[in-house]
Amino acid sequence: MFHATTIVAVKKGEQVAMAGDGQVTMGQATVMKHKARKVRRLFHGKVLAGFAGSVADAFTLFEKFENKLEEYQGNLQRAAVELAKDWRMDKALRNLEALLIVADKQSMLLISGSGEVIEPDDGIAAIGSGGNYALAAARALVKNTDLQPAQLVQEAMEVASSICVYTNDQIIVEEL
């Protein structure tokens, strides 16, 4: 499990939103930064990507993923599969410790270093130390409210930040 991060994403129809907290923790006990940006727009603003794990590793993966998006003309699924293949096969990449959630208006995917590319059945994904709390909150909110994706991820992150010590309430939301 990756500490110091929570990312949650919700897709409803062609609307998608992703949120991440801002906390960066060094080791197990020291908060080094409160307002880190862990959710980004890629490929001319058409793709959202969020990471959990080592910051340096995540920047490497963002760059590799954006290169794959360019190579495959924005085809999210193809770019994700190719990144996962490289991540699994390349000796240097294999040592990177991170998870990614990527989304565009058509799909949302979770990408892991073990080569997994998973599309959630319900259009909801969460990763990181507070991921399970955010996932549970998002699912409950989707089922019981009419909130839009941006509001859903904001609320889910607030729940996670109130429970997980590695997740703060400095939440950044991006939406398509």
From Swiss-Prot:
GO terms for molecular function: metal ion binding; threonine-type endopeptidase activity. It comes from the Bacteria. GO terms for cellular component: HslUV protease complex; proteasome core complex. It is found in: Cytoplasm. Belongs to the peptidase T1B family. HslV subfamily. HAMAP family: HslV (MF_00248). This is ATP-dependent protease subunit HslV. It comes from Desulfitobacterium hafniense (strain Y51). The gene is hslV.
